[in-house]
Structure formats: structure tokens, C-alpha cells
Amino acid sequence: MTKPIKTEVINTPPHGRFGFVRKFDIHTGFDIYCSDGEPVFAIEDGIVTDISHFTGEYTTPVPTPWWENTMAIAIEGKSGVILYGEIYEPSLRIGDKISEGQHIANVKRVLKNDKGLPMSMLHIELYIHGYRGDWAVWNIEEEKPNELCNIETILSKIYKL
């Protein structure tokens, strides 16, 4: 497995970790804070299964205009479907074969307003094999969506969390 962001230390605060209960929802992924434009690499071999809007005014079912417009790419490999979000539009296409360690995208600044928090991050989620559909929303007081898995099980093998 390859690190998606080439850093030795991840300084992810609790609110950026999988399963953290936020004001309006529960966090569905893991945020790796980094610079705008930071290269993103594939964790494992796979095939591109989706490229879509992730944050901003074009997201569905609920637009998030308080965030910048960002994209996501999903790659299905041996661990399941890994979503890499909060990126610039990638040059890859659905159906492309991806090799572990291949440059797949670049991180895009997601926050519009500086509130003293990191403004750019790679947001990563993990889904069951074969999943195709809308990316999970995990509402407070609801069970974790069945298709959503804890990405930290993979990240803990390649980073110290």
C-alpha cells in the first residue's frame, strides 16, 4: 500500500477522523491536511469507478455552497471502493486502470473562509466492493450506512494514526 499524501506525520484533529460526531452529521471519512495542489497517489491498484462533484454548489443531494467546488474520484481495488475527495478535477476517466502509487489527482482548497483551521485536505472514504451510488451521508442518531466502511483500517497500515 502507498501513502496517498507523501507525509510522515498526520496531524488530523478529532473532527477530521472517521465517525466523529459533528454539529449536523457524523464524519464519513478521514481528512489528511496538506497544501492546496498537493499530489494525491493511489493507495492500491484498481479501476476508476466514479468521478463526481464532492463539495460546493454542484453537490447532490444537498449543495454545500459554503465550501469551494471540489471533485472526488473513486477507485475500486482489493480493499473495496476508495473515494479520494476534495481534489481538482482529475485527468483520469471512468474505467481507467490505476497502479498503486500512481499520481491520480491534486488536493484542492475546500474551505472558502479562513476560520483558523486548515483550508486544504484530502478527504478519504471507504465503501464495500461493488458499491456504486451517492456518497454516504451519516446523519446524527442514525446507524452507519451499510455501504460505508472505516477507512482508518487501511490508513493505520501506512501511517501512524
Model region roles, listed by residue range:
Residues 33, 76, 85, 99, ...:
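Residue-level detector of conserved, well-ordered beta-strand and adjacent loop positions
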Residues 43-91, 115-123:
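Zn2+-dependent peptidoglycan hydrolase active-site motif and core
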Residues 39-51, 92-107:
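Short, well-structured beta-strand-loop connectors
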Residues 1-5, 90-102, 109, 117-161:
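Acidic, glycine-rich catalytic/binding loops that coordinate metals and/or anionic ligands
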Residues 34-36, 77, 88, 128:
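Short, flexible loop/turn elements at secondary-structure junctions
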Residues 38, 78-81, 131-132:
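Short acidic/polar mixed-charge low-complexity motifs
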